[in-house]
Amino acid sequence: MIYVLLFIVLVFFSVQVFSLGIMLVHEPSVISPRKVYPKISILLAARNEEELILRNLSALEKLNYPLDKLEILVGNDASTDNTANLIEDFIKDKPQFKLYYIDKTLGKGRGKANVLGQLAHHASGAYYFITDVDVKLPKSWVLALLQEF
């Protein structure tokens, strides 16, 4: 079961990286409005990312997507710097964000795969999107990815 979950997470990550690459080369100038906004779970693994974490969280906060249909799950992977404190301070009074402290290993998963696998267990969205702390996300990121569904 864990291998299936990790495989799914890795497939989603690969599709997302490919889609984001296409968006960065040519971001759609017109994104059709949706009639239905499905619930989206965004998974973000963070380990010792104090230099970039606030930029990424700020970009996620500014996404053009209804807040009640969005959950952003951040997994702090045993950071030894100030990453966890920065995340905690940023997400106060932002119910769409949830921070999870990852201190155990799920199955044989290690590193980022372990963090994403554990976050996937907490996610409740119809779609899971995975990003990385060092990715610059455009406001239209979620809507652009949903254009394909």
PLM feature spans:
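Acidic donor-binding segment of Leloir-type glycosyltransferases
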Residues: 57-105
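N-terminal membrane-anchoring/stem segments of glycan-assembly enzymes
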Residues: 1-36
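Short, well-formed alpha-helical segments that are part of the catalytic scaffolds
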Residues: 22-30, 49-63
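Glycine-rich, basic loop-to-helix element that forms the pyrophosphate-binding segment
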Residues: 103-123, 144
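Donor nucleotide-sugar binding loop of glycosyltransferases
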Residues: 49-52, 79, 138
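Short aromatic/hydrophobic "clamp" motif used to bind/position activated sugar donors
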Residues: 128
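Acidic donor-binding/catalytic loop of UDP-sugar-dependent glycosyltransferases
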Residues: 82, 133-148
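Cell-envelope/extracellular polymer assembly enzymes that use nucleotide-activated donors
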Residues: 38-41, 71
